[in-house]
C-alpha cells in the first residue's frame, strides 16, 4: 500500500487542463472520453470507424458521442491491442490527419485527443487541431515525445506500459508490489516531464497493458493509491479482457461489466473514463456523482 503524504506529491493537485486556444477542460467532476478507432483491427469491432473519403461514419459517431455527453473524443490510428500489427508513422498519419481535420472542421469547440506514441504524429496532429496527446508508452517508445509535448504546450496523457503492444503480454511479472511500481514509474516520468516544460498531465495506469486480468482487478481496487501523485487519473476499462474474460464472454457482450467497473473506478477517484459507449458512461458518472458528491472546493 502507498503511504506517501500529500506534501510529497510530484505536482500540486491540478484538475483543469489548459488546451490550445486557452480552452479549459475541467476535471474537478469526472468526464467521459469517447473512443473513435480508425484502425481495421481494434479488438472491439463496433468501435472501428469505416474508412470513407467524406468521413460520414466518423462524423456521425462523433456527433452521437458529443450529444450523449462526451467531453473529449479520442482518435486512434494505431491499434494497441495485444499482438496488434505494427504500422509505420507515415501510415498512421495517413489514417489520422484527414479524419482529425474533418472532426475539427465539424466540431470546432470539441476537445479532441489523439492516441499516439510517436512524436512526429503528435506534432502533425496538434497542427491539424488536436488538443490532447494520449501516449500509451509514456514516452518510452519515442524519446522525442516529452520535448515535443513541452514545446507544443498541450495536455499529455501519461500511461504505464511495459514492452510494446506486440510484446506487452510477456511483461506481466512484477518484482515487487505492482501498484508501488506504478507509482515509482509515474514519479520518475514526471521528473522528466517537468523538465520538458509539460504542465498539464493525466495519469493512465494502463489496464490490460502488461497486466493480467487479475492484476488489472487489483489495480482497479487500489486505484485510489495513485492520488498521492496529485494528478487526474484516466481509467480505460471499456470492454477489455479484465471485463469479459473472467465472465467467459466476448468484447461485444461486455457492456454491463464495463459499467460496473467504471463505477468502481469513479469511486476510487478516476476523473476521466475512456469508453466505447458514451451514453452509458455518462449515466454512470451522473449517478455515482449524485450518490457520492465531490466535496466543495
Regions found by a protein language model. Name each.
Residues 33, 70, 111, 131, ...:
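Hydrophobic "anchor" residues on beta-strands that sit immediately upstream
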Residues 39, 73-77, 159-160, 202-207:
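Short beta-strands and strand-loop turn motifs
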Residues 2-13, 18-21, 27, 42-61, ...:
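Active-site-adjacent loop and "lid" segments of alpha/beta metabolic enzymes
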Residues 25-38, 66-76:
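N-terminal glycine-rich anion-binding loops that anchor highly charged ligand groups
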Residues 35, 135-136, 205:
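Short, well-ordered coil/turn residues at beta-beta hairpins
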Residues 65, 73, 133, 201, ...:
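Hydrophobic residues within beta-strands of alpha/beta enzymes
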Amino acid at each position: 500500500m502507498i503511504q506517501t503524504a500529500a506534501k510529497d506529491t510530484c505536482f500540486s493537485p491540478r484538475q483543469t487542463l489548459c488546451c490550445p486556444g486557452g480552452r479549459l477542460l475541467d476535471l474537478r467532476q469526472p468526464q467521459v472520453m469517447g473512443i473513435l478507432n480508425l484502425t481495421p483491427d481494434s479488438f472491439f469491432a463496433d468501435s472501428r470507424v469505416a474508412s470513407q473519403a467524406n468521413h460520414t461514419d466518423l462524423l456521425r459517431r462523433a456527433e452521437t458521442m458529443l450529444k450523449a455527453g462526451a467531453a473529449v473524443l479520442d482518435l486512434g490510428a494505431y491499434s494497441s491491442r495485444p499482438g496488434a500489427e505494427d504500422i509505420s508513422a507515415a501510415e498512421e498519419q495517413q489514417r489520422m490527419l484527414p479524419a482529425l481535420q474533418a472532426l475539427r472542421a465539424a466540431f470546432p469547440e470539441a476537445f479532441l485527443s489523439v492516441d499516439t506514441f510517436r512524436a512526429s504524429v503528435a506534432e502533425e496532429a496538434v497542427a491539424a487541431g488536436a488538443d490532447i496527446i494520449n501516449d500509451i508508452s509514456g514516452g518510452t517508445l519515442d524519446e522525442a515525445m516529452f520535448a515535443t509535448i513541452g514545446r507544443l504546450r498541450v495536455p499529455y496523457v501519461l500511461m504505464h506500459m511495459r514492452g510494446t503492444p506486440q510484446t506487452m503480454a510477456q511483461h506481466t511479472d512484477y518484482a515487487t508490489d505492482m501498484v508501488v511500481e506504478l507509482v515509482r514509474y509515474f514519479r520518475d516520468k514526471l521528473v522528466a516531464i517537468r523538465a520538458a516544460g509539460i504542465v498539464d498531465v493525466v495519469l493512465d495506469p494502463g489496464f490490460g497493458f502488461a497486466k493480467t486480468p487479475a492484476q488489472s482487478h487489483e489495480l482497479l481496487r487500489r486505484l485510489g493509491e495513485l492520488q498521492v501523485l496529485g494528478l487526474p487519473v484516466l481509467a480505460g476499462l471499456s470492454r477489455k479482457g479484465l471485463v469479459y474474460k473472467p465472465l467467459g464472454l466476448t468484447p461485444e457482450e461486455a457492456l454491463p461489466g464495463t459499467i460496473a467497473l467504471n463505477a468502481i473506478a469513479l469511486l476510487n477517484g478516476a476523473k476521466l473514463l475512456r469508453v466505447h459507449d458514451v451514453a452509458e458512461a455518462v449515466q454512470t458518472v451522473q449517478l455515482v456523482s449524485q450518490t457520492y458528491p465531490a466535496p466543495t472546493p
